[in-house]
Amino acid sequence: MSVSVHETRKSRSSTGSMNISVFHKASHPDCVLAHLNTLRKHCMFTDVTLWAGDRAFPCHRAVLAASSRYFEAMFSHGLRESRDDTVNFQDNLHPEVLELLLDFAYSSRIVINEENAESLLEAGDMLQFHDVRDAAAEFLEKNLSPSNCLGMMVLSDAHQCRRLYEFSCRMSLVHFETVRQSEDFNSLSRDTLLDLISRDELETEDERVVFEAILQWVKHDLEQRKVHLPLLLRNVRLALLPSDCLKKAVSGEALLMADECTKLIIDEAFRCKTKILLNDGVVTSPFARPRKAGHTLLILGGQTFMCDKIYQVDHKAKEIIPKADLPSPRKEFSASAIGCKVYVTGGRGSENGVSKDVWVYDTVHEEWSKAAPMLIARFGHGSAELENCLYVVGGHTSLAGIFPASPSVSLKQVEKYDPGDNKWTMVAPMRDGVSNAAVVSAKLKLFVFGGTSIHRDMVSKVQCFDPSDNRWTIKAECPQPWRYTAAAVLGSQIFIMGGDTEYTAASAYRFDCETNQWTRIGDMTAKRMSCHAVASGNKLYVVGGYFGTQRCKTLDCYDPTSDTWNCITSVPYSLIPTAFVSTWKHLPA
């Protein structure tokens, strides 16, 4: 005799083995839930009544507690409602919204539309129907527009919908010149406004837009808000304002001169502006930090893998224009920008000698100069700017006594360059030495993705350096081992693309450096090994690379809002990109 799932008796066959039959009805949970809903509608076995406005909703405590941590806590932790047979939300909850949530609890289905999405998000968060809250947030994401993104930013911040907040914030940054004219803008909290104006991704080529926006916000409620003006001013890139605008602010804006603190801020901005225009040393002031939309894209490359020229990308004309020759052609170097200067570090020269040299290109004055040499000659390394200093990571150096230079094992050593002192110092070495890795900075930390190990294997680790305690940690594993990838940063998101295998060459991923979580994004338009990527505005740009014998001949753009890649322009056949940087576009006099 076989044993049904409902029986507890056991039996054995003649061979002594257990004979069991398990019956499973997949639709049983739906049937039970549907019948409970019928019982609810007929007020059968209900043991609590919810009130919203003037409407009553008889329910089963067990169903509510199973659907919502809010109700589970209410009914089980000795609260008054755990003994009463009614729970009255009064006017804190609209009856139609509560009805929708109860229908979801009893059916697992809910209809979300433009009229109820915001209310469902708020109520779902309040009553801890988190699935409904997240579904409403996803609906609102898909219906974001410049006319509602500020409101969505405020709503999502209040209800811990981080993804909707980032999407809303990103749209507000892209359309800042439009949204700052809306009534929602004047209703922003100080902290939300501060979050917007402090971001590098705010899209404007004229910092006067930001300057005028904060004055507008303060004047909307002058008595309450004037105390916030110094903090807001410190997050405007005042040194990027035209000189006549700064002078006009001093002479014609009484609000700025009414407070000693704001006067000191304006004076500091003037000094910074003068220092830049006179090319008087390195400027690291936050007043002079350009927005990403105020950047230009520079490609370093040549007709061979030996780089000898800088090219500028003209977005509007969709052209790539030669700008300047490198003083010393080289290959396998690294390049990064700090403000208006591009730092070219190390590499190998025409005779394959490994270099310590550091060449600096000033994009404002279009001049080359030499900085202090690195402490270690290296090639195949990575570099990134972090808090106005340059970090050089990993790579190879040459084996002593061998000519031409042969690569050593991958280096662990990391160097830091301070432009103010023109001096290199060693910082803590990496946990694992790597070369050909993707190196970027985000959230005041340095991130190194993959690379080639000391054993010449591909690496799958994400190594992270925190300068505040001079320590490296392993943050996560990459989706697969990587080398010859590109990386670029938008906010707290790091985008990684390309690689040297069939599987990784066209793939792209997003890494959240706050949660250490990976998300696969849309594939690139072509397979790219040794490509180069930068962020500008709220988009990513990728150039160069090859796969097999095929060179990639396009400059492509990724829009994270739509998760799509598009070709911007073709790269001249005579240009093989070796590095790609984003630096100041212009400095208004």
UniProtKB/Swiss-Prot annotation:
GO biological process: negative regulation of fatty acid biosynthetic process; positive regulation of CD4-positive, CD25-positive, alpha-beta regulatory T cell differentiation; positive regulation of fatty acid oxidation; protein ubiquitination; regulation of translational initiation; ubiquitin-dependent protein catabolic process
Presence of the UniProt keyword Repeat in the record: yes
Pfam families named in the record: BACK (PF07707), Beta-prop_ATRN-LZTR1 (PF24981), BTB (PF00651)
Gene Ontology, cellular component aspect: Cul3-RING ubiquitin ligase complex
Sequence ranges assigned to domain BACK in this UniProt record: 149-250
Ranges annotated as spanning the membrane: none
Record bears the keyword Transcription: no
Keyword annotations from UniProtKB, A to Z: Kelch repeat, Repeat, Translation regulation, Ubl conjugation pathway
Kelch repeats: from-to residues: 296-340, 341-388, 389-444, 446-492, 493-538, 539-585
Cited InterPro entries: BACK (IPR011705), Beta-prop_ATRN-MKLN-like (IPR056737), BTB-kelch_protein (IPR017096), BTB/POZ_dom (IPR000210), Kelch-typ_b-propeller (IPR015915), Kelch_1 (IPR006652), KLHL25_BTB_POZ_dom (IPR030565), SKP1/BTB/POZ_sf (IPR011333)
Gene Ontology molecular function, alphabetical: ubiquitin-like ligase-substrate adaptor activity
Pathway listed: Protein modification; protein ubiquitination
Domain spans labelled BTB: 46-114
Function field: Substrate-specific adapter of a BCR (BTB-CUL3-RBX1) E3 ubiquitin ligase complex involved in various processes, such as translation homeostasis and lipid synthesis. The BCR(KLHL25) ubiquitin ligase complex acts by mediating ubiquitination of hypophosphorylated EIF4EBP1 (4E-BP1): ubiquitination and subsequent degradation of hypophosphorylated EIF4EBP1 (4E-BP1) probably serves as a homeostatic mechanism to maintain translation and prevent eIF4E inhibition when eIF4E levels are low. The BCR(KLHL25) complex does not target EIF4EBP1 (4E-BP1) when it is hyperphosphorylated or associated with eIF4E.
Subunit structure of this chain's protein: Component of the BCR(KLHL25) E3 ubiquitin ligase complex, at least composed of CUL3, KLHL25 and RBX1.
Name of the featured protein: Kelch-like protein 25
Organism: Rattus norvegicus (Rat)
Lineage: Eukaryota, Metazoa, Chordata, Craniata, Vertebrata
Gene name tied to this protein: Klhl25
